[in-house]
Curated annotation (Swiss-Prot):
Main localisation: membrane
Compartments where located: Cell outer membrane
Protein name: Porin O
Record's function text: Anion specific, the binding site has higher affinity for phosphate than chloride ions. Porin O has a higher affinity for polyphosphates (tripolyphosphate and pyrophosphate) while porin P has a higher affinity for orthophosphate.
SUPFAM superfamilies named among the record's database cross-references: Porins
Induction per the UniProt record: By phosphate starvation.
Source organism of this protein record: Pseudomonas aeruginosa (strain ATCC 15692 / DSM 22644 / CIP 104116 / JCM 14847 / LMG 12228 / 1C / PRS 101 / PAO1)
Bilayer topology annotation: Multi-pass membrane protein
Signal sequence, renumbered to the chain: 1-24
Pfam families: Porin_O_P (PF07396)
Source taxon at top rank: Bacteria
Amino acid sequence: MIRKHSLGFVASALALAVSAQAFAGTVTTDGADIVIKTKGGLEVATTDKEFSFKLGGRLQADYSRFDGFYTKNGNTADAAYFRRAFIELGGTAYKDWKYQINFDLSHNTGSSDNGYFDEASVTYTGFNPVNLKFGRFDPDFGLEKATSSKWVTAPERNAAYELADWINTHQDGMGAQVNSTLADMAYLSAGVSAKDADDSDGDSVKQFNFRGVFAPMHEAGNVLHVGVNYAYRDLDDTAFDSRIRPRLGMRGIATSGGNDAGDNGNRATFGGVSNSPAGSYKDDSVWGLEGAWAMGPFSAQAEYLARKLKADDNAYKDIKAKGYYAQLAYTLTGESRQYKLEGAKFDSVKPENKEIGAWEVFYRYDNIKVEDDNVVADTATREVGDTKAKAHNLGVNWYVNDAVKISAAYVKAKTDKITNNNGDDDGDGFVTRLQYVF
């Protein structure tokens, strides 16, 4: 029933956006005049900028094929699914209050109990340049996470984030954040979140995030960006899932919503267990570094993170992990990646030629390592010692226009001390995406 009503809402919203084409322009009222824009969704705003309303969305349809380590038996499997299907509603109220609601119809974010919200937040901007944000949103950690999923270069973000997926996902929690730009060359943010998990007393897990970026050059085609990140969560007396289970660039092995490889998908556990009991671990912390440089159509970026899950019982050992990625991208048609200092992030590539669009090629190298000394005996798929993985990502993006993007990427993964059921320690995958945003 919920899905039926959701689809009805989407159809109505799209019909409203289309019908509004006939009314685009300025409407005179007995109060402030209203400006209606229909390029890229439906946007309505008063001329005094006191109020605004924008209806938009994003649709990402993916298809992937993969084999080797990516499947349990090593044979080829595939997956066709909506990676994201967002309806987005945002705007301004009384000039200084901003709101944003993103609902995921593909059910890849959120949950049935808490709603499939990618974001539901309110931001107060009256202390310019300081912003205060409240609600459900992803904590701020990392350049690639700060960049919208619409405009990240590869179909999936880097594998290093999967070493500690809690650092920049809301996990059905609520949070508060303060952020600001400084002297037209820096960005700072700090936040606290109450996650959906509770300790033995029913007190929610608290998480703290900090991100600082220095970007003295921050224009399209002229970017210099360096930053540091820190995330911490208190796990005292908390039972939780401590598994580290990277997908290594192939979402299709196990999607949160939609078709995947089913029981044959191999989302292997590199460290941790599914049911770490209360009292086993005290806290969890992650440090991160990020850097980027762009000149004209060329861009390079890299990130590094190190995690320590600290044991609180002599029966358990600390779990440590570290990882990094390095990425190069070049737009063959000459366009530059856009960049925004507010949020310290890359943005879209805007095609200059409306007939051929913009063509971008990229390469990314991912490398991760997990040290879990709680593993003291070999199993059929995991040896004692540090598990490792590396992945090569080679792909192309075609920005057909401002709304449509088509992507294709080949991923080659190699692991150490961990295999699938067939003994494979490498795998190949190919993923394509059709994206439409409005």
